[in-house]
Amino acid sequence: MKVMSSVFLASILTIGSAFANVTVAKEISPAKSVDNIQMNSQQELVDLFFAAAKIGNSEVINEFLKHGFPVDVRNKDGYTPLMMATYYGHQAIVSSLLKHGADRCARDNRGNTALMGALFKMEFAIAKQLRQVDCDAQAQKTGQKTTAEFAKVIGQEKQLQKLIQEQEKAQAKTQK
C-alpha cells in the first residue's frame, strides 16, 4: 500500500504538470506564450504544495521535497509552507520542512515569521521548535517587530518568556 501511495504521489507531480500543459494547450492563442503556460503549471504545483502544508498531508510534502521542490517557495501573501504548517498546527510537517532547510526567519508581506504565527495560534510545541534560532537581530535592523514585541501585542509575552527560559535551561544542561 505504501509503495502504491508513493507511486500515486509521484504520478501526481508528473501528470499534474503534463495535465496543466495539455489543459492550457487547448486554449492557446497566438498571443499566449509558452512562458505563461509554464507559469500556470508551476503555480498549480505551488498551490498543491501549500494545500498539503495547510491540511497536514506529510506524504505529499515529503514527495515534493524528495523531488527537489523549493522548501521556501512563497505565495502571493509572502507566506512559506513553514508558516502555513505552523499556523494550522501540523508539527510533523514543520519538522519535515525544517529538516529540508526551511528558513525559520522568513517574513511574510506583513513582516511576520512562522514563530509569530505559532504564538498567535498558541501552538507552543511548534513555537519551541522554531525558537531554536533567534531571528530578531535582523528585525531590529530593518525596523520590523521582534518576536517579543509581537508576543506582547497578542498577549503571549509570558508564554514566550517561559519558552525562552526552558531553552536556556536546556542549553545550560547540555553545556555541563
PLM regions and their residue ranges:
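Intrinsically disordered, low-complexity regulatory segments in ankyrin-centric signaling systems
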Residues: 4-5, 16-67, 168-176
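Conserved hydrophobic site in ankyrin repeats
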Residues: 64, 97, 130, 163-164
